[in-house]
Amino acid sequence: MKKIVSLVCVLVMLVSILGSFSVVAASPVKGFQVSGTKLLDASGNELVMRGMRDISAIDLVKEIKIGWNLGNTLDAPTETAWGNPRTTKAMIEKVREMGFNAVRVPVTWDTHIGPAPDYKIDEAWLNRVEEVVNYVLDCGMYAIINVHHDNTWIIPTYANEQRSKEKLVKVWEQIATRFKDYDDHLLFETMNEPREVGSPMEWMGGTYENRDVINRFNLAVVNTIRASGGNNDKRFILVPTNAATGLDVALNDLVIPNNDSRVIVSIHAYSPYFFAMDVNGTSYWGSDYDKASLTSELDAIYNRFVKNGRAVIIGEFGTIDKNNLSSRVAHAEHYAREAVSRGIAVFWWDNGYYNPGDAETYALLNRKTLSWYYPEIVQALMRGAGVEPLVSPTPTPTLMPTPSPTVTANILYGDVNGDGKINSTDCTMLKRYILRGIEEFPSPSGIIAADVNADLKINSTDLVLMKKYLLRSIDKFPAEDSQTPDEDNPGILYNGRFDFSDPNGPKCAWSGSNVELNFYGTEASVTIKSGGENWFQAIVDGNPLPPFSVNATTSTVKLVSGLAEGAHHLVLWKRTEASLGEVQFLGFDFGSGKLLAAPKPLERKIEFIGDSITCAYGNEGTSKEQSFTPKNENSYMSYAAITARNLNASANMIAWSGIGLTMNYGGAPGPLIMDRYPYTLPYSGVRWDFSKYVPQVVVINLGTNDFSTSFADKTKFVTAYKNLISEVRRNYPDAHIFCCVGPMLWGTGLDLCRSYVTEVVNDCNRSGDLKVYFVEFPQQDGSTGYGEDWHPSIATHQLMAERLTAEIKNKLGW
C-alpha cells in the first residue's frame, strides 16, 4: 500500500516548482532534501511525485503507447473461475519487463453487487481489485479499470434505460470513491462493449436507440465520477461506442460527455476480422494490400479524433493462433507502429488461453510459469511501438497436446463429470479444461464426452455447443449423429451440385462446391482436371491453407504434408465460379495413410441464388479499378459461405457473374438465371435432381445486373422474380425464401430494385405464402473498401453475412 507523505514545509518549498501533487514513498521517511525538481529522502532516494498533472489526454495516451489486458481474470465470476491463476505482482512485473507501459484490468461486478437500491459492492471484491491495481501502479505503469461483462443488466434500450442507469451510477459511485485519491496513472472506462445482446444490430453499430442510450449512460457515469471528489474531477475517463466498434454508424453518433477534454474514446479493433478473429478465415497477413488496408483504418480513426484533439485508446486488439506465427508477428509490429505513430495507444487482449489452432488463443504470457508463449509477438509489438524491453523474454517451450479420444459405448455427450446429467457443472468444468485450469475430467470417459461435435478436438467450439444445449437452443450434440472415423466405412462427403456419371470421378462447376473427408496419416494429395483457370482452398483441421490453381489441365497437387500422424479433417473448396469451367476430382492420395469414414452431412441447408456478388467476384482484390482475376475470387469468404458457417449449415451456391432475371450486365447476350438454375453442369447440359438437396432456406440476391447500366421493365422484372420464387417453391415446398437487395446498387437503380422486390414479397405474403421475406444488405460506401470492379470486399461480405445471419436466426430460430 502506498504511503502518502503530507509535509507542509516540503509542499511550501516545492509547490511553485511542481504544482499540486501527492508524494509516494516506499518506506517511512525520516528526512528530505531537494535536488532540482526532485524530492529525495534522507538516504538520497528519489520520492515519486504523483498527482493529477497538467497533461492533455493526447499527451497521456502518447505516454502509454502499448498496453496489455489482464483478461479472463477479474472479469470472470471469480478470479480463477475461467482457468487463470490468481494474479500476482510478479506476473505484472513480468509484463512490465517486456516494455508494456499499461495494464487494462477488466472487472465484472455483477456477481459481487448487492440488491437495490444501494447495489453495494462486496468489500472483499473491491479490495482485491484495488490490490491488483496497486500491483500495476507500483510497477510504474498505467492502469485502466472498467465495468466489463455486465451486459446482463446494462441494457441500452429506452425501456431499460432508467433501471440500468440507476445501478450503473451506484456502482460507479463506489468505484470512484474508493479510487478518488489515486493519481492520473489510473484511468476509468465507463463500460466495456455496451450493446443490446442478441439483437440483429448487436455487432453492427447498434440501432439509433442503442447508441442514444449508451451516450446517456456515458454522460451519467462521467458526471458521477467528476462529482465524487479527490482527483476524480481531473480523472481521465474512457467512453466506448456501441460494442466499442469502429464502424462509422457508431462513431458518428458518439457524444463526448460535456465535451470533456479528459474523456478518451475507447475502441476495440481486431482488424482485419478474418485474420484476427475468424478461425475459418485467412491465416496469412503481410501483403502490401493488407498493410495499406490496416493503415487506412487507423488513418480514419486519427483523422476523425486525434487530429481534432480527441484522444483514442484501442483497448482491445490481437490475433488468434492459426499456426501462423510469422503472419501474426508481421501484423503485430505493423499494427503497433501505425497506431502509436498516430498517437493511438493499443492494448493486446491476453485472455490467458493457449491452445494453438483454436478460436480463443490470444494468450501471450504463460501466467503459471511466467514465461512467454510467443516472445516473437511481444518483441514485434515493442519494435512497432518504439519501446525497448527491460529484459529478453523467456519462451514457453512446449505445446499442450489435445487428447485423442477412444470410442466407448454408451457415452452421454456433455456429461464430462460422469454423474449421468448434463448441467452447468459440466459446462464450467469444460471451460476450466479448455483454459488449462484442470488437466483431466473426473469421469474416465470425460475426454470423449467433452468432444460434443466429434471433431477429435476439445476447444471453444465444444463450449459454445454446450452452452447452446443448456439454453435449449439445440436439443442434441453433433457427436450424437456423427460417425466415428475408421477404416471400415471410408468415404467422401460432396457438398454442392455434383455429377457422378463419369466413373473416373465426380464433376462440379458452381462456386463453393467442395469435398469433405477424414483421413489418417501425415499428408494428402489430390488429382484435379479443370476446364479453365479454377482456384481451390484446402482447409485442414480448420486451418485454411494457401490457395492454388489448376488451369485448363490435369494436375496432382500436394495439399498438405508433415502433419502429426493421426486422424485429420480436410475440406477442398472450389473458390471460383462456374463460368471458369467444370472441375473433375480424379482421386485423393494419403501416402502411407488412409481414407476414413465420411463426415456426416449437416442438417441445416441453405441454397443461394445470385450473381457476381454471391460468387464473391474479386473480393480479395486490392482496388475497385482492378479488373477481374480468378485468383481474387474467393467464394469461401463470400457472404453466402460465411452465413452458412455462422449457422452451422451447408451452402449450395447457384451464381453466375453478370447474370440477371430479365437482362445481363450491360445488356450482354446469353442465358439468364432461369436458364442456368436447373443445371448441375451448365456447360455440359447435365440437369440437377432437386430431391438430392432440400434446403430449409433459399436466399435470392438478384437484380443488380437488371438495374446497373439500364433499368429493367417493371412488369418483366416482377414477373420473372415471381416465376423464380414459384420454381423454388415447387422444388422446396417448405423452404423459407429470403429476397435480398444490395450492396452494389445506388440511386434510382437501388430505389427501383428495392421497390419491385418488396412488391414481389408483399404479393407472396398476401397470397398466403408467409415464408417469403425481404432483406436489404448494407449498401457499400467505401468505408470497408472495395474488391475488383467495384465489387464488395471481404469486409463488406462479412457485414452482409451478419445482416443475413440475424434475419435467418430471427425467422427460423436457428
Curated annotation (Swiss-Prot):
Signal peptide: 1-34
Impact after mutating residue 612 to A: Loss of esterase activity. 8-fold increase in the binding affinity to cellohexaose
Pfam families listed in its UniProt record: CE2_N (PF17996), Cellulase (PF00150), Dockerin_1 (PF00404), Lipase_GDSL (PF00657)
Control of this protein's activity: Esterase activity of the CE2 module is inhibited when this domain binds to cellohexaose or beta-glucan.
Region (Esterase), start-end ranges: 490-814
Binding locations of Ca(2+) 2: 451-452, 457, 462
Enzyme Commission (EC) number: 3.2.1.4, 3.1.1.-, 3.1.1.72
Pathway(s) per entry: Glycan metabolism; cellulose degradation; Glycan degradation; xylan degradation
Subcellular location: Secreted
Active site per database record: 193, 316, 612
Recorded GO CC terms: extracellular region
Outcome, altering residue 789 to A/N: Retains significant esterase activity against 4-NPAc and the polymeric substrates
Protein family according to the UniProt entry: In the N-terminal section; belongs to the glycosyl hydrolase 5 (cellulase A) family. In the C-terminal section; belongs to the carbohydrate esterase 2 (CE2) family.
Protein name in the entry: Cellulase/esterase CelE
UniProt gene name: celE
